[in-house]
């Protein structure tokens, strides 16, 4: 996300804290941010606080911060940790929002889902949207939908599909470079044509896979081998994992 903000020439002063001093030095050099090794000073300087730690580390971090006596807008990027837990651990005058920015934010092509309480002011809502819109598209949704979004939106699905398709391409005779090029075109460029156009995914599938043709035969073979079921099982496993974060 820092790389995406840098790419967008964001005007905000960004102060970064991390207990790993080596990481702080690297971020200062690479992303042109102000670093603050002292957690309490970093929090004291912030009028918008972004908590970007692993879900299992959220409670430890909030305990380390202790009580904050002034109003601060706080955004949690921790997957699966609900607003209720955040507010209970680190409540008023902190105003909590949850956001899930994708790794593609580094290139300005991100997608961020935001979930906020009904009590959040329009001004705070705009501040959050404005921040994440600098690194890609922003959508708002009820918190109850955020776990499912977290499982589905990950760029890992694209990388996983690319690796699998390119691997299969190499097995039938293509060299690695050509296999990756052809597979990336099939996935990325095909999806861009859908996203930037006005055609439904169903109509594009019908167009690309004529009955009895090569594409239709390939897709049918994948389905027979359990492609759709494998995707569903993977998504279900991911959903169980993200929901387990609330219990860590």
Feature annotation, model-predicted:
Residues 8-28:
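NAD(P)-binding Rossmann-fold cofactor-contacting core
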Residues 34-39, 139-141:
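Short acidic-hydrophobic, aromatic-tinged amphipathic segments that line or gate anion-handling sites
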Residues 184-248:
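NAD(P)-dependent Rossmann-like dehydrogenase/reductase catalytic/cofactor-binding core
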Residues 14, 24, 42, 58, ...:
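Small-residue helix-packing motif on alpha-helices
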Residues 1-2, 21-26, 30-31, 39-114:
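Rossmann-like NAD(P)(H) cofactor-binding subdomain of soluble oxidoreductases
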Residues 30, 85-95, 111-148, 157-198, ...:
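Internal alpha-helical scaffold of NAD(P)-dependent oxidoreductase catalytic cores
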Residues 2-8:
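Gly/Ala-rich phosphate-binding loop of Rossmann-like dinucleotide-binding domains
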